[in-house]
Design a protein with these regions (language model features):
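Soluble catalytic domains of membrane acyltransferases
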Residues: 21, 38, 42-172
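Extreme N-terminal tail/first-helix region
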Residues: 2-43
Length: 172
């Protein structure tokens, strides 16, 4: 946000905001701006536009609202945010909508672990930004789980940190 309280377009060492362009993208960006402004959050960093794939470590995750806030931030940056969900979420009449919203299904009933399933998901996509809450729960937890690291390492993608600073209401 600038001094007048308006959310500024991302700029700086990474250049412009991220990949998607077009009327629908701008509509989503506008909705994201309205949501972020309404709840009092602002963006404190630029998006690295030359990173087509990443694991985004999103912390802390202490509320269901954090997910919606991260989706709004992704809309502001014009990126599609992916997230892991159990495979049953993408089945049924609304499964297509869940998948379209960014869910990457994890099949828990197979012997293949989630890290390998995410590695395969990264391998089959041209771009993918997977948001992972390292706490593994919405409770305050100083001991992070390490799955995000293993996913990034096995997929050969960078880790990006997304920090929700509740004190200043700035996402960095």
């Amino acid at each position: 946000m600038d001094k007048t309280g308006h959310v500024k377009r991302a700029s700086g060492p990474f250049g412009r905001s991220a990949p998607y362009a077009g009327l629908f993208s701008e509509f989503i960006r506008g909705l994201s701006w309205v949501y972020l402004r309404t709840i009092g959050w602002r963006i404190g960093s630029d998006w690295p536009v030359h990173v087509p794939k990443s694991v985004i470590v999103a912390a802390p995750h202490t509320s269901n609202w954090d997910g919606l806030t991260m989706v709004a931030v992704a809309g502001w940056y014009r990126i599609k945010l992916n997230w892991m969900g159990k495979a049953s979420l993408v089945r049924g009449p609304l499964g297509w909508l869940v998948k379209r919203s960014g869910c990457v299904p994890v099949e828990r009933s197979t012997s293949q672990d989630a890290v390998e399933q995410m590695r395969q998901a990264f391998a089959t996509r041209e771009t993918m930004h997977l948001a992972v809450a390292p706490e593994g729960t919405r409770e305050a937890n100083p001991n992070w789980k390490t799955g995000f690291y293993h996913i990034a390492r096995s997929a050969g993608v960078p880790l990006l940190m997304a920090v929700l600073d509740y004190r200043t209401r700035v996402l960095r």
